[in-house]
Amino acid sequence: MPRLVLASAPAKIILFGEHSVVYGKPAIASAIDLRTYVRAEFNDSGNIKIEAHDIKTPGLIVSFSEDKIYFETDYGKAAEVLSYVRHAIELVLEEADKRTGVSVSITSQIPVGAGLGSSAAVAVATIGAVSKLLDLELSKEEIAKMGHKVELLVQGASSGIDPTVSAIGGFLYYKQGEFEHLPFVELPIVVGYTGSSGSTKELVAMVRRRYEEMPELIEPILESMGKLVDKAKEVIISKLDEEEKFLKLGELMNINHGLLDALGVSTKKLSELVYAARTAGAIGAKLTGAGGGGCMYALAPGKQREVATAIKIAGGTPMITRISKEGLRIEEVRE
């Protein structure tokens, strides 16, 4: 049995189809190469101990025993991550039918609350690290299902997109609860974070209100978004060369952003980052996720640095990254 395991899992972006997916339309999501790292090892206390050094918020150390939670420090949003980690560890211990002290230490490149799936990534990386520590053989699909279960326990509702993308990696086409893996395309992207986040629940409710008040206007927008996702899928699986794929996907990104703007989920800051990216040479740029803040992303072959600079000048936090073919990764095992 190993004495220490280090695992990592990637963030995700919704490439196409946010909001319309709520109405039964498809969406395409992908893993991106921003990662959360979880180190797991045994401890002698018999408790679960979580150290969160860097979740893009100040660190904290928390110990759980059967009936008490010990907070050594307490800083804002970092605390939100703890429920995911605790449930992830407990599910693995339950699956392995073991009760032992486990310490996990978390470091992350993924900002919390930015719509990039930070909660799913930490849950998946924790399940991967702790299951390996306990010599429990789980497939990536099984880990994705456990990650989905963690989200249900913490959030009460979840489509399962985030943990599935984080565990398995690459591109995922999602429609009404069913997943389909798409061929891998290397997309050079830049993610821009506005520094604030909107409430997914409130934004979904706002779109629902508009849909109920003006179905004759909103239904065609949602219908167009669904068709756009299927068009993007066609491009991804086509035999077109890389440059042609980029051009077509970029055009679809720009249309998708316009449709999301028409639904009312973009913000002044998101649009500023989107247009700054396009002006700097991005082929396409759009918001990703619920909107109301959070992130946008730009497709910028050969122009990632220029686009990142433009996003920074426009007041955003740029992250140069790429689509991650790999999902969950075991980085290190010490016997």
From Swiss-Prot:
Pathway(s) annotated for this protein in UniProt: Isoprenoid biosynthesis; isopentenyl diphosphate biosynthesis via mevalonate pathway; isopentenyl diphosphate from (R)-mevalonate: step 1/3
Gene3D superfamilies recorded: 3.30.230.10, GHMP kinase, C-terminal domain
Job description of the protein: Catalyzes the phosphorylation of (R)-mevalonate (MVA) to (R)-mevalonate 5-phosphate (MVAP). Functions in the mevalonate (MVA) pathway leading to isopentenyl diphosphate (IPP), a key precursor for the biosynthesis of isoprenoid compounds such as archaeal membrane lipids.
Family, as annotated: Belongs to the GHMP kinase family. Mevalonate kinase subfamily.
Reaction catalysis annotation: (R)-mevalonate + ATP = (R)-5-phosphomevalonate + ADP + H(+)
GO molecular function (one): ATP binding
Residues at which ATP binds: P111, V112, G113, A114, G115, L116, G117, S118, S119, A120, A121
Stated name of the protein: Mevalonate kinase
Protein location: Cytoplasm
Keyword terms: ATP-binding, Cytoplasm, Isoprene biosynthesis, Kinase, Lipid biosynthesis, Lipid metabolism, Magnesium, Nucleotide-binding, Transferase
Cell inner membrane keyword on record: no
